[in-house]
Amino acid sequence: MAISAGNVHLQTNTSSSIDTDAIEKIQSLTSIPLVLHGSSGIDHTLRRKLASTTNICKFNIGTELRKTFGDNLRKKMDQNPNIYDRIQLINLPLQELKSVTKTVIENITKF
């Protein structure tokens, strides 16, 4: 079941104020696994805590990954103005994207 507890879709910063009391109340009323949409705006430390202490089974973090890719693509294109090949360009930000993806996965994996 998808819930919202202070999180916002398409949030591009990590300043969400998550209502953990609301999450606890919701999970006390249902045995259905919870989904937290808009998780990109939630700090990694809090995501890790929620993953290990609640029945949230899915964190939607697409905006965080798209923002990482887009920000790094812009930066790499500025640093490499002589690269025009689209395959080379699209590969420039992949290392940063892999790093952020790894961090995200590590912080939402149940223990």
Predicted regions and their residues:
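Short acidic/histidine-rich active-site segments
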Residues: 39-43, 61-64
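Extended, intrinsically disordered, low-complexity segments
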Residues: 76-111
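Glycine/Thr-rich beta-alpha phosphate-binding loop at enzyme active sites
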Residues: 2-21
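Glycine-enriched alpha-helix->loop->beta-strand junction motifs that scaffold or abut catalytic
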Residues: 28-33, 52-59
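Catalytic cores of alpha/beta
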Residues: 40-55
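Glycine-rich phosphate-binding active-site loops on the catalytic face of alpha/beta enzymes
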Residues: 5-8, 54-72
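Short, conserved beta-strand edge motifs with alternating hydrophobic and charged residues
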Residues: 1-4, 35-38
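Alpha-helix-loop-beta-strand connector modules within alpha/beta enzyme cores
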Residues: 15-36
